[in-house]
Amino acid sequence: MGLIALAVVAGVAALAYRMGYNRSRTELASLREEMEQMEAAGKDAAIVKRVSQQMEDIAYQQKAISDQQRDRAEEQSILATQNAYRAEMESRAAHEAELKAQSAAQVAERERANAERQQEIAVEQRDEATHAKNVADTLNRRTQARSLAVSSQVRREADEPEVADLLAYASWYFLKNNRGNQYYSETFKSLTQATDGILRYKMKEGGAVNALAKVPGRLGQCVAVSNFGEVERLTVNASQGGKRISSNALLFNSLFDFRDVLIKDNSIYALSLKGPLCVLDFEGNHVEVQLPEDNYFKLVPIGDGLLVAGRKSLSWYSDGKITGSEELPGTLSAIVEREGVTCLFFTDGGYAEMDVAGRIVEKAPLLKGVVTAAYYDKASKCLLLGVEDGTVYPVNQYDRVMETMAAHKAKCVDITMLGPVVVTGGYDKTAYIWNMDNLLFESGLSFREELQKEKVEKRVSGSQEVPTEWLVPVDYTFDGWALAVCGDEDGKSVWIGTSSGNVMLLNASADDMAQQLHNKLKRNLTQQEWIRYVGVSIPYMTFK
């Protein structure tokens, strides 16, 4: 029992041992596993610890770096603040400097503008001084030119032709080159004397020369008719010592009182106050065409025939006879053909126009007053009208009166035009010569410009413009009324007939006479002559 018990005990012990052994082994294994786990965990913990330590070190390093960066950032912030403050101060300083610069620039601009204005004022004053000097010099030369013209005539009377010629040319030269009027009477007359610019002839019977007509295609030839029934062909011929006018009497009949003459198709038509109309050739052969009763005064070329104008009627002439007549509604004072229209002026101041078919239409008068002389220039399309008080009016193609040309002191009775030169005759025993290119129009425009303008505005000349001298016409006074004026075929000379029976051929071109005179000059004025006649205010110059 005891053995059994011992056995049992041993068994139990063995079992217990086995059980404890097994349990211990299990626990050991578990412990070992735990230990392994713990070792692994320890290793991991060590690693973690090391990593943590490293991370902590890194963190400390990063913290140190962060602290350093923060410190630097703070330093940068402080520096930035300082820089911002400095920049603000510099900006303020720059703004103040800019304001000062702007202020200085404004001052400089004002000073520059003031300097420019002062310069402009100086330039204006200089220009004004120059202009004043130019005006003074111009006026001085114009005045001197007039004095030289008078001196020229005096020297010619004193039989000093060379000096007289030089003074006449100098007079024209100073006027021509200083916008003066080279048609100043004394200058023009001194040129005429120097160039034999006027020729004279006395009608054979001494009748009043009522009309003149140039001979087409013949220089220096015209036909003159008088109230004594004379019809003479006048010709300029060269002679010893110059030129003279010779005459060929084509007709003389004291019963005729010729009032007009016209040359057409190589025939001469001479119109008597009470008729007839005499038709002549250049040999003196003639036929007489009887006219209806009237006081006849003008011949007007119309188509292939003529219009014979009486004071109260019009008659048409063609193919050697009168083909028709018409009574007028009033008394004619003047008549002229203008671009296919016949202009009729009446003694009551009325005006009418007649077309090619003979229809007469009353129109508004072109101007106030009674028109007593009319001439139409086809080249310029200028209608020239002279009136009872002696005034002459140029009218352009638009029926606009361009200017008032105060001329004769009595009735203007005849007008002609050669290029820009207008010549008028009147009952004041004077013939006037105007150069329209020299005429100072109120509008400020030239004659050529005025001709093309339907309307004009008054224009004020610029301050820098030396004024053109007002044109005063050349006046030639005769011993009788200047009844007839007619341009010569040369386009420069004009025939003038007077009530005393004289006929003159006058060169109406100052420039042409000046050129002739220049060509004949033999020398220049000496220094002493220059000082004597011209003076010291105008520098010496030569003309030869």
Q: Where would I find each of the regions flagged by the language model?
A:
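WD40/WD-repeat beta-propeller blade N-cap
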Residues: 203-209, 252-256, 291-294, 328-330, ...
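Eukaryotic protein-protein interaction scaffolds centered on beta-propeller repeats
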Residues: 13-211, 216-217, 227-228, 238-244, ...
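Short coil/turn segments that connect the beta-strands within blades of beta-propeller domains
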Residues: 219-220, 265-266, 303-305, 339-341, ...
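WD40-repeat beta-propellers
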Residues: 232-237, 280, 317, 354, ...
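A short beta-strand motif characteristic of beta-propeller blades
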Residues: 198-203, 242-252, 285-291, 321-327, ...
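Short coil/turn segments within WD40 beta-propeller repeats
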Residues: 229, 275, 312, 349, ...
